[in-house]
Curated annotation (Swiss-Prot):
Changing E221A: Loss of function in ERAD. Glycans are attached at N94, N169, N190. Belongs to the OS-9 family. This is Protein OS-9 homolog. The keyword Glycoprotein applies. It is found in: Endoplasmic reticulum. Lectin which functions in endoplasmic reticulum (ER) quality control and ER-associated degradation (ERAD). May bind terminally misfolded non-glycosylated proteins as well as improperly folded glycoproteins, retain them in the ER, and possibly transfer them to the ubiquitination machinery and promote their degradation. Targets the misfolded LRR receptor kinase BRI1 and the misfolded receptor-like kinase EFR. The keyword Transmembrane helix does not apply. It comes from the Eukaryota. InterPro entries: Man6P_isomerase_rcpt-bd_dom_sf, MRH_dom, OS-9-like, OS9-like_dom.
Length: 282
């Protein structure tokens, strides 16, 4: 669907649901809302302006006469559709920009460097019978503790494996994933032998960006004796790949058409057989 058609639908929805009582308003413009399909796509705000304080458009806008359900006429200005200069989507261009900025910042710390504060102490998570201990770049342990911190049962889910980690991160890319869902992984292998498979336990530790404190947020068994442990880390948010792309924001301005101008415009439209789009009253 072309962007003009999408914007037209947004304006129609706004006109259908909005009442325009200019004399009762404190502010000259009436902001209906912000529209966007996701946090990467451009955001569009729609503002309705009264006759005595109209919007003055530039040359880069398209205009269209619209009717609301009360028959009031508005001249709305929509951003012109940009001609595609490449086969890339706006999301891909955003990602490409982030990658280029990342490469240009020579002193930018890598995700592993940003994770170093986790080495200061081990993190724990309690889930029912079991407790889980994560010691950064050392090991992940599953244990059951009773009175006075007495360990009565324990399994090592894995010890840090730098070679397996490097190989894993070479084959997995999060560039196409929304920044809020990206994570950086470390692989821990050679854990306690699994009774069901006869192989050592393994765990993938997934580090995610979170502004709150560092903590283990979840532990999942992906398959028999193979686990995924999620750790949130505030310092990881400093890396561009884990920062949310800020979408471009546009405002669609709709000027109330004065009665005199409305009559003139009606005659012109009838002469060229151009009628405004009517919005059905629901």
């Amino acid at each position: 669907m072309r962007i003009t058609q999408i914007l037209l639908c947004l304006v129609i929805v706004a006109l259908s649901s909005s009442s325009h009582v200019w004399s009762d308003q404190i502010f000259p413009a009436h902001l209906v809302g912000t529209f966007s399909r996701n946090n990467r796509e451009p955001k569009y705000k729609i503002e309705f302006l009264p006759e005595d304080s109209p919007f003055h458009p530039g040359d880069n806008l398209e205009s269209m006469v619209m009717l609301d359900k009360h028959g009031n006429r508005f001249l709305c200005y929509l951003p012109k559709e940009e001609k595609a200069t490449s086969g890339w989507t706006s999301s891909q261009q955003n990602i490409s920009t982030v990658m280029m900025e990342t490469q240009q910042l020579v002193k930018l710390k890598t995700p592993d460097e940003l994770l170093q504060p986790l080495s200061e102490k081990c993190l724990f998570r309690q889930e029912g019978w079991w407790s889980y201990e994560f010691c950064h770049q050392k090991y992940v342990r599953q244990l059951h503790v009773e009175d006075e911190n007495k360990i009565v049962q324990e399994f090592f889910l894995g010890t840090f494996d730098p070679e397996a980690t490097a190989a894993f991160n070479q084959t997995v890319s999060d560039a196409s994933t929304d920044a809020s869902q990206r994570y950086h992984s470390h692989v821990y292998t050679n854990g306690t032998t699994c009774d069901l498979t006869g192989s050592p336990r393994e765990v993938e530790v997934r580090f995610v960006c979170a502004e709150t404190r560092a903590m283990v947020t979840s532990i999942t068994e992906l398959s028999t004796c193979k686990y995924a442990l999620t750790v949130q880390c505030p310092t990881l948010c400093k890396h561009p790949l884990f920062q949310l792309e800020k979408p471009v924001s546009h405002t669609i301005h709709c000027n109330a058409i004065p009665v005199e101008e409305d009559a003139t415009r009606n005659k012109e439209e009838q002469a060229v057989d151009e009628s405004p789009k009517m919005i059905a009253d629901s």
